């Protein structure tokens, strides 16, 4: 991807973010508006859905590259790596599933989880040996997705930031001289983010 196409991509994503949510209506005095204010507007939900699909496509390409170029497909060592990384997951208590769905709780958890993944993607971007443009695209798109979703969270203080020690721990793993550990960690991050986004996509569709 040349600099011109990269700039065009960045501009396109920023435009998506800028138009993701319509101008807010009256803050009070309209009971009908109050009744529907908890739901994502149709156009907003569509834009969020399309952005998630875009990110999933890029992740799929990166995972294929990991498999083809580094022979890093499914691996039994991932179970150990997963325990060490504590990557974000969506669980029943997060209110994102059909049973027990809670939009505010779900939006907060998805946004917080993506903020955590941003940290991993930032470090991954600096250590990935394959298609760095795809990694940059995933990182940038995820950042925009966070902003789109966070704007709909009522109590934004509930969106927590990652523990700084996570940064140092992951950095140490990815700078390891053990290529197998490094590639397994990258593969796991991509796979976990893919799973997280797939569950998020289902949740967005019922908001």
From Swiss-Prot:
The keyword Nucleotide-binding does not apply. The keyword Disulfide bond applies. Pfam families: IL6. GO terms for molecular function: cytokine activity; growth factor activity; interleukin-6 receptor binding. This is Interleukin-6. It is found in: Secreted. Belongs to the IL-6 superfamily. The modification Phosphoserine is found at residue 76. Cytokine with a wide variety of biological functions in immunity, tissue regeneration, and metabolism. Binds to IL6R, then the complex associates to the signaling subunit IL6ST/gp130 to trigger the intracellular IL6-signaling pathway. The interaction with the membrane-bound IL6R and IL6ST stimulates 'classic signaling', whereas the binding of IL6 and soluble IL6R to IL6ST stimulates 'trans-signaling'. Alternatively, 'cluster signaling' occurs when membrane-bound IL6:IL6R complexes on transmitter cells activate IL6ST receptors on neighboring receiver cells. IL6 is a potent inducer of the acute phase response. Rapid production of IL6 contributes to host defense during infection and tissue injury, but excessive IL6 synthesis is involved in disease pathology. In the innate immune response, is synthesized by myeloid cells, such as macrophages and dendritic cells, upon recognition of pathogens through toll-like receptors (TLRs) at the site of infection or tissue injury. In the adaptive immune response, is required for the differentiation of B cells into immunoglobulin-secreting cells. GO terms for biological process: acute-phase response; glucose homeostasis; hepatocyte proliferation; interleukin-6-mediated signaling pathway; liver regeneration; positive regulation of cell population proliferation; positive regulation of multicellular organismal process; positive regulation of receptor signaling pathway via JAK-STAT. Component of a hexamer of two molecules each of IL6, IL6R and IL6ST; first binds to IL6R to associate with the signaling subunit IL6ST. Interacts with IL6R (via the N-terminal ectodomain); this interaction may be affected by IL6R-binding with SORL1, hence decreasing IL6 cis signaling. Interacts with SORL1 (via the N-terminal ectodomain); this interaction leads to IL6 internalization and lysosomal degradation. May form a trimeric complex with the soluble SORL1 ectodomain and soluble IL6R receptor; this interaction might stabilize circulating IL6, hence promoting IL6 trans signaling. Disulfide bonds join 67-73, 96-106. Keywords: Acute phase, Cytokine, Disulfide bond, Growth factor, Phosphoprotein, Secreted, Signal. SUPFAM superfamilies: 4-helical cytokines. GO terms for cellular component: extracellular space; interleukin-6 receptor complex. Residues 1-20 form the signal peptide. It comes from the Eukaryota. PROSITE patterns: INTERLEUKIN_6 (PS00254).
């Amino acid at each position: 991807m040349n600099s011109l196409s990269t700039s065009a991509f960045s501009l396109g994503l920023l435009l998506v973010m800028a138009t993701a949510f319509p101008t807010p209506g009256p803050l009070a005095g309209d009971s009908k508006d109050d009744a529907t204010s908890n739901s994502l507007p149709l156009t907003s939900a569509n834009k969020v859905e399309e952005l998630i699909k875009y990110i999933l496509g890029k992740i799929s390409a990166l995972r294929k590259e990991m498999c083809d170029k580094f022979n890093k497909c499914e691996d039994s060592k991932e179970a150990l790596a997963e325990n060490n990384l504590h990557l974000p997951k969506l669980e029943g208590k997060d209110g994102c599933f059909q049973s027990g769905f809670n939009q505010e709780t779900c939006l907060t958890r998805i946004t917080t989880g993506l903020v955590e993944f941003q940290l991993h993607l930032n470090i991954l971007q600096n250590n990935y040996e394959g298609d760095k443009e795809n990694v940059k695209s995933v990182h940038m798109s995820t950042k925009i997705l966070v902003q789109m979703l966070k704007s709909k969270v009522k109590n934004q203080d509930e969106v927590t930031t990652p523990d700084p020690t996570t940064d140092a721990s992951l950095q140490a793993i990815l700078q390891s001289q053990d290529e197998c550990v490094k590639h397994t960690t990258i593969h796991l991050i991509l796979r976990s983010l893919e799973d997280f986004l797939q569950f998020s996509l289902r949740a967005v569709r019922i908001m």
